[in-house]
Design a protein with these regions (language model features):
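N-terminal leader/linker segments that initiate helical-solenoid repeat arrays
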Residues: 1-44, 49
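Canonical positions in the second alpha-helix
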Residues: 46, 85-86, 119-120, 153-154
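Structural marker of alpha-solenoid helical repeat scaffolds
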Residues: 49, 89, 123, 156-157
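Alpha-solenoid helical repeat scaffolds
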Residues: 58-59, 95-99, 129-136, 149, ...
């Protein structure tokens, strides 16, 4: 029966609607309340069926960052375990690496976040979204040279949001004022 690849169009059409209708509802995704039980229970069901379900991984990351509790005796006792399972299931899914990197960075694990961003960039070097998000990370950790390169890829290929450009400009201005 499962697990299913979230990116597979056949599985998305045949199996995803049932999982999302009963377990990954808008209330579960937003962590407001569970559909068939607890929020965590519905997220667990969704991620058992689709280990690399991008939106559910974002939700489990938010759940953990907001202090949600995982059962110690559960077979997947932490958000990290869900990400590790998703990566083991489909190591070529660059989006999973980016979502995990974002989670790690927000949690303060900069070195591990960097590894996941690098993995995502290696899997999808031309992805404007991945270049943009990784560029934001590199600005935040002070690697402006790398951030500029990633921004160039993103913006040369049509990325519409100006946030990375603005962050780079602000970081450059701060560098110049410190140099004075």
């Amino acid at each position: 029966f499962c697990p299913f690849d979230y990116r597979d169009p056949v599985n998305k059409q045949a199996n995803l609607p049932v999982v999302e209708a009963f377990h990954f509802t808008p209330d579960v995704e937003s962590l407001r309340r569970g559909s068939t039980g607890t929020v965590l229970g519905d997220l667990q069901y969704t991620l058992r069926a689709f280990p690399n379900h991008h939106r559910a991984l974002k939700s489990i990351a938010r759940y953990a960052l907001e202090g949600g509790r995982f059962q110690i005796d559960d077979y997947i006792p932490s958000a990290d375990c869900y990400f590790e399972r998703a990566i083991a299931f489909r190591p070529d899914d660059a989006a999973v690496h980016v979502i995990y990197a974002n989670f790690l960075f927000k949690r303060g694990d900069r070195d591990d976040a960097r590894k996941q961003y690098e993995e995502a960039l290696g899997l999808a070097p031309e992805s404007v979204e991945i270049n943009y998000v990784a560029g934001l990370y590199f600005v935040d950790v002070g690697d402006l040279t790398r951030a500029r390169k990633l921004a160039k890829v993103a913006y040369d290929n049509g990325y519409p949001l100006p946030g990375l450009k603005k962050k780079i400009a602000a970081a450059e201005a701060a560098e110049k004022s410190r140099a004075k």
